[in-house]
Regions:
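Acidic (Asp/Glu-rich) sequence patches and key acidic residues
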Residues: 1-115
Length: 115
């Protein structure tokens, strides 16, 4: 079962921007596109993903964020909602740490679900 991690970015981002910010956590990691590009997976090697960036959506209504993430802090809109998932294992923990660090570079709030 994967763990969901949501990034709420104050500025416009694309999937590649998020993947590049995640890669800063470990310079030995790599990235690969899934499904011809709409999703990107950050991996520690060819067979061990640490976090997958599923997509980015612009959100223009704070009510939508509040409805889906009632514990999220109030942020100005528009914002960019980034969906990611990590494995529920040691690699996934590395992915969560990378997401928390990337949130600083992306001017984002990072919400780790299931913690």
């Amino acid at each position: 079962v994967p763990r969901d991690v949501t990034l709420l970015c104050r500025g416009e981002v694309q999937v590649r921007d998020v993947a590049e910010a995640l890669l800063l956590h470990d310079d030995a990691w790599g990235v690969r596109a899934l499904d011809d590009g709409p999703m990107m997976q950050v991996c520690r090697d060819a067979t061990h993903p640490v976090i997958t960036v599923l997509g980015v959506r612009r959100v223009d209504e704070l009510d939508e964020v509040t409805r889906l993430l009632p514990d999220a802090p109030a942020l100005p809109v528009p914002l960019w909602w980034v969906d990611t998932v990590t494995p529920f294992d040691a690699d996934g923990e590395r992915g969560v740490t990378a997401a928390l660090e990337a949130s600083l570079d992306l001017d984002a709030v990072c919400i780790v679900h299931g913690d």
